[in-house]
Amino acid sequence: MANGAKWDATNLPIRPGLYANFVKAAGKAVLGGARGIVAVPIFTYDGGKAVSGKFYTIDAASDGIDLVGNANATPITRILEGGAKEVLVYAVPALVIPEDSSKQFIDLHEAFAVQDFNVFVYPTVIDDTVQATTKAWVSECRNEGKHFMYVAGGDAESDADIVTGNARSVALKDEYIVNLVTGVVLLDGTEVQSADYAPHIAGLIAGTPINKSITYVELPIADVTLRLKNSQIEKALTSGSLVIVKDGNKVRIEQGITTDSNATERGKIRTTRAKQAVATDLPAAARDNYIGKIDNEPNGQAALIAAFKAYLETLEGENVLTDPRVALSSNFKSEGDKVFIDVSYEDLDSVERIFLTITH
């Protein structure tokens, strides 16, 4: 069953299902699903109960320790501390041929591709080749109707040079990808590289309602490993980097953006997650209530349109989006077993910049 996969008018899909084309406004849905699941592959799980090649759902840090061992559970704990509802853990099989690490990542991507989750993150540092492979995987999944965010990070060396972190953001440019470029200092003084803190950010994104932004969210840490000047922060933002800043006695996320950003426009995590929710919920509702169950005639089409519109109006009422519109397509004829519906809405963002003119 297709689940919001892309469609092409010159090569229509064969399988029954709902297919979505995003034209800078998007396909939509009908019943909000759980959005707080973070997926993480764990490569070392000695001392725990995990079995190689198996998936596990964790909702408590103590269960994570039991599963993968105390020494390996930090990524799971950080995801939950960030606010995720659940952690989908995959016990990655050990390499049969040590030199063939690329196959290990390809295989784990294939394993995760058929699981349900909202945000993906690695437990620690990966190399540039795997980053590129993961970016391609995110895009491939999106084209097949699987929508999730990927949170990336770097090692301590790249955290010490914002130019390097920004270059990674540019290389990972995608509306579904977030790149953390700031290492952090925990409350106990421990320095943590951005790749190791990325699980906390993944949990924060997953646990934040889709009508809220993570911009200026305060983090439970003491400092960052590299404080940036204003000009450096601005350059990082236009490069698509997620930056953490020391703001007086607080440490905050500067702006909740994706790597799909430039000098004039920032891709927002909030609007991307709203789009993903719509693209995920609509196919589920269509599959459960409409596909194969209504006639392709005016009354059946009207029922489908009304359901889609009602869902979007619910999101509008929750300040997720504005101005939803649903109608039969005027460009394609709905006949046989095919229905073409145009859905549009306006993104709703948070107030993030306030400009004052003070006269005295």
Where are these regions (language model features)?
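Surface-exposed assembly/interface segments
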Residues: 1-360
